[in-house]
Amino acid sequence: MAQLGEQTLPGPETTVQIRVAIQEAEDLEDLEEEDEGTSARAAGDPARYLSPGWGSASEEEPSRGHSSATTSGGENDREDLEPEWRPPDEELIRKLVDQIEFYFSDENLEKDAFLLKHVRRNKLGYVSVKLLTSFKKVKHLTRDWRTTAHALKYSVTLELNEDHRKVRRTTPVPLFPNENLPSKMLLVYDLHLSPKLWALATPQKNGRVQEKVMEHLLKLFGTFGVISSVRILKPGRELPPDIRRISSRYSQVGTQECAIVEFEEVDAAIKAHEFMVTESQSKENMKAVLIGMKPPKKKPLKDKNHDDEATAGTHLSRSLNKRVEELQYMGDESSANSSSDPESNPTSPMAGRRHAASNKLSPSGHQNIFLSPNASPCSSPWSSPLAQRKGVSRKSPLAEEGRLNFSTSPEIFRKCMDYSSDSSITPSGSPWVRRRRQAEMGTQEKSPGASPLLSRRMQTADGLPVGVLRLPRGPDNTRGFHGGHERGRACV
């Protein structure tokens, strides 16, 4: 603006006046903009959250915002710039090459599942140099991946890719047994169980038993694919190098006579293995396992005994649970068929069978014969001394408050009130307990049941003992209950 004023108006004074006017106008505009900005921020404008360098519209203020941006950008650029790299010396190169070559060796890859996983993940077998630099033993030597990549240029067994960021072996990585990947070799064992091979194993005139066995295996497995080799392994003899490393995993190798059938394709070995699995369902046949897969596991004797004990414990727990359920069912059945139900059918054959089974299972089942008419088909007079002594201390189902319903049967309510002093109502047969309860109810003077002798001899107007609704019923022409030693026998 000032340069344009100087060109149009050559006079120096005029130029000064124009500059002053422009400056005043700019100041006024700045003040108006500041007032508008203040009012906007007061009204909740989002511009109030902006920094001063980016929120101003004046000609002087933008320099602050741009300067801050330039400064931050320069700092980021400096952070992105990596420090100056220098090539390592020969000693460091040698140590790095030796360490990483050991990482990629067969001996280490067979044990190092992590590195082997990264080798298998890449189709070409490359592994990141940065990943190798992060390994503990390499990190002690250098932390710069460029130093590691420079050292790997001098390796004989390793090679880098085009951008020198990944490395791989020059030779392919073999298939290790612990990878559980199918291979081309099939291990056939238990050869003596095959009927055909057993016939071939008999002494031959020409003595070529091993050749006969190999011919039989070629004929058997040749239908699945092309076979490259068949080897018979004798126990106690030295194993080939490629079989020696799997002998620790497959216990059949070296301990019994077995055969190694190697196919030219993996699919053929897989098909042959599937065929042998179906054929070896019966124990009287030879078996096969695909080398590279997990060997068949045999349960040790301890586990078998443990399984037998666990099975026996399970059967015992089931029998105990069944016993508890039977006892609960017996209690429900006896209460359902008790004397509180006037419509109960004592001659029901189903109830008789249920109670007979309960009496056989439970040693205390004979105690319920005084409470339930369905518990025994026989009858017995109350005058029996044994029945009196045992019947006094028995608990009547009328004492179960949860099963009584006085509103439905007033007769039951009346009888319970009349016979409340009997020992069958109270859980305990002790006379002192009965006296205390009768004193609380205010019926001690009216009730003659305080005496244990009277409670045994008291009878109602119907001729029944106190607390008994009716006598047990049984078939006609019977003499009552048998003695204690004959009670377990069924009545005919």
Curated annotation (Swiss-Prot):
Oligomeric state and interaction partners are given as: Interacts (via the HTH domain) with VIM/vimentin. Interacts (via C-terminus) with non-muscle myosin MYH10. Interacts (via C-terminus) with DHX9.
Entry keywords, A to Z: Acetylation, Cytoplasm, Nucleus, Phosphoprotein, RNA-binding, Translation regulation
Segments forming domain SUZ-C: 427-485
Q: Which CDD domains match?
A: LARP_6, RRM_LARP6
Instruction: Tell me where in this chain the PTM N-acetylalanine is found.
Output: A2
Location of the HTH La-type RNA-binding domain: 86-177
Q: Where is this region: Disordered?
A: 1-87, 292-398, 466-492
Q: Report the PROSITE patterns cross-referenced here.
A: HTH_LA (PS50961), SUZ_C (PS51938)
Q: Which Pfam families match?
A: La, SUZ-C
In what ranges is there compositional bias, type Low complexity?
332-346
**Where does the record place Polar residues bias?**
65-74, 359-386
List the expressing tissues. Expressed in numerous tissues. Highest expression in heart and brain, intermediate in kidney, skeletal muscle and testis, lowest expression in testis (at protein level).
Subcellular location(s): the record lists: Cytoplasm; Nucleus
Residue numbers carrying Phosphoserine? S56, S58
**Positions of the RRM domain:** 184-296
Q: Which domain of life is it from?
A: Eukaryota
- SMART domains assigned to the protein according to its UniProt record, in alphabetical order: LA (SM00715)
What is the name attached to this protein's record? Answer: La-related protein 6
Where are stretches of biased composition, namely Basic and acidic residues? 483-492
Per the annotation, the residue ranges of the short sequence motif Nuclear export signal are 186-193
